[in-house]
Amino acid sequence: MDADAVRERAADLPTEPGVYQFRAGETTLYVGKAVNLRNRVRSYADPRSGRIRGMVGRADRIEFAVTDTETQALLLEANLIKRLRPRYNVRLKDDKSYPLVAITDHPVPRIEVTRDPEEGAVAYGPFTSKGRVETVVKAIRDEYRLRGCSDHKYANRDRPCLDYEMGICSAPCTGEIDPESYAEDVAAARRFFEGETGVLADPLRRRMEAAAENAEFERAANLRDRLEAVEAFHGEGGEAVSDHSDDRTVDVLAAAVEGDTARVARLHSERGQLVDRSRHRLDAAAVGDDGEGDEDGFADPDANTPAAVLSAFLTQYYAEREFPDAILLAERPSDPDVIDWLEAEGVSVRVPGAGREAKLVELALKNARKRGGREDPVGALGERLGIDRPARIEGFDVSHAQGTAVVGSDVCFVDGSAETSDYRRKKLTDRNDDYANMRELVRWRAERAVAGEDDRPDPDLLLIDGGGGQLGAARDALAETGWDVPVVALAKAEELVVTPTGTRRWPDDAPELHLLQRVRDEAHRFAVSYHQTVRDEVKTVLDDVPGVGPQTRRRLLRRFGSVESVRDASLDDLTDVDGVGDATADTLRERL
C-alpha cells in the first residue's frame, strides 16, 4: 500500500477504540490497538522507520475490529498476536519453569525434584541448576532415607523395594520405621531447605572423615564432592528471598533486549516465598535501518526497548492467566494503558526503589540478562552439523539392570523446549547388549514412521545417548527401514559429539552443546524413570545367590550401588562387606 491508499482507508475507519491488522494476502503482518482507529491508521501514511515503511509497502489491505473500551482493545490485540504471530509484532515464544524441591502433603511424605508440585506440597526454590538440586536431594535421601516412590506404589508394597536395600529409603511402606521416627527425618529435611545447612553437612562431613580414615579414598572423594554441593547450596540460594509476613501473591518482572530478541524473567512469590521462576523469550521487531524511531505513537519502532517488551508481555501473559495481587517491575511499561488495565483489575503495579522488593527486581533482571546474545541454539546446532535448522529433535536412551527390565525412551524437543505430549517409551527385549537394545529402539520408531503409524511429525534430528557404538546401531536401524533422518550421538564421559563423519569436541559454553545435553539428559531421565517402574516387578539376581540373605544383600547394594558393581568387585572388596566370607564371595563371582 502507498501513502494515498493508507490515507484513503483511514478515512473510512471509525473514531472509536479497536484493533487493526495490516495484511498481505492471508498473512497478518502487524496487529495494533488504538484509542481512535482513524487517527492511528492514518499515521502509517508517513512512517519514519524504514522497517515500518517496508511493512506498509508489503500490505495489501487493512482490517479492523471496533471494541467498546480501550481495555477490550488491549486484550483483543494480545490474543490476536498470540494466535496469528505477526512478523512485525513482539511475540511471546516460550515459557520454561525452573525446578523446585517438593515434600508432599501425605501422612508419609515423599521428597522429589519437580517443576509442578502437587497441591498441598511444601515447595522450596526455585533453583537454576537441576543437577545441583538432584545432588542435594540424593544426599538427603542417603542420610535421612526419605521415600521417593509414588503414593500408588507406597500403598501397594508388601515388601521393601531396592531403594531400601540400597539404604536410600527406610521403607515406611512396610513398617521398617515407625511413623514418629520418619516424621523426624522429614522435619530434618525441611530444616535444611529452610536454611539450616548443618543438618545435612555435619553428618556428611563425619562420613567423609571416617571413609578417609579407613583408606576408602574413592568413597571419601565422592562424599567430599557431595559435601561441597551441600555447603554451596544456600550460598546461591537466597535464590528465594523470603518474607513470611507477606501473604500476597506477587509477580516480579524484568526485561532485557539484545538485537531483535528479548527475554523476560518472571519470579512468582506466594506468602513471602518464591515458588516459581520462568524465563520467556520474545521476538522484538527492531527499529528501521535508518536507526530512527517513529514519533507518531506507533509502538513497533521502539519494540526493542525493555519498556515496550514489558508492555507486550504483560498483555499477552495475563490475558489468559489469573492476576497476582501485585506486580513489581524493573521499569514502567511504555504503554500506560497496560498499567491502567492491570490496576482496574485490582493489581498493584510498582517499580520499587529499595528494600526486599528491589532485591527481587534485581534478581529478575539478572535472570533476564542471562545468556544474552545467544538466543538461537537450535539454529546454531543446525549450522554446526551442516543440516537445516532442527526445530524438532528426538532423543533416545536405553536403561536396564544387567539385561533385565530393559526399556527405551524417546523424548521430543521443539524449538529447544521439551514437548512432553510427544514423549514415548517402550519395553525392549531383555538382554545385556546396549547396541542391540538401541538398534531395536530406533528401529521401532523408524518402522512406525515409515508405515505412517506414528501420529507425530518426523523429527529434524535424532540424538542418541551414547558413543560411536550406539550411533552405529541407530544408523543400522535407519538404513534397514529406509527412514532418512540425520542422527548424532552425545557421549557422556567427555561430552563428545559423535557424527557419522567423526567425533567432535565442541566448546563447553556452546549453546548448541547445551541443547544436546538437555535433550540427552531428559532422554536418560525418562528411561531411568520407566526402568525403575519396571524394575520393581523384577527380582534382583542377588535373591538367588546361596548364602546371601536380606541383610547381606542390603549391605552389598549399599556398598556397591548396583548389581553390576557387585559383579565387577574384586574378591577382596566383596569380603570387606559384613556377612560375606570367602565362600560367598566365590559364589557371587560365579553367579554374576
UniProtKB/Swiss-Prot annotation:
One of its GO terms (biological process) is SOS response. One of its GO terms (molecular function) is DNA binding. The keyword Glycoprotein does not apply. Gene3D superfamilies: 5' to 3' exonuclease, C-terminal subdomain, GIY-YIG endonuclease, UVR domain, UvrC, RNAse H endonuclease domain. Keywords: Cytoplasm, DNA damage, DNA excision, DNA repair, Excision nuclease, SOS response. PANTHER family: UVRABC SYSTEM PROTEIN C, UVRC/OXIDOREDUCTASE. This is UvrABC system protein C. It comes from Halorubrum lacusprofundi (strain ATCC 49239 / DSM 5036 / JCM 8891 / ACAM 34).
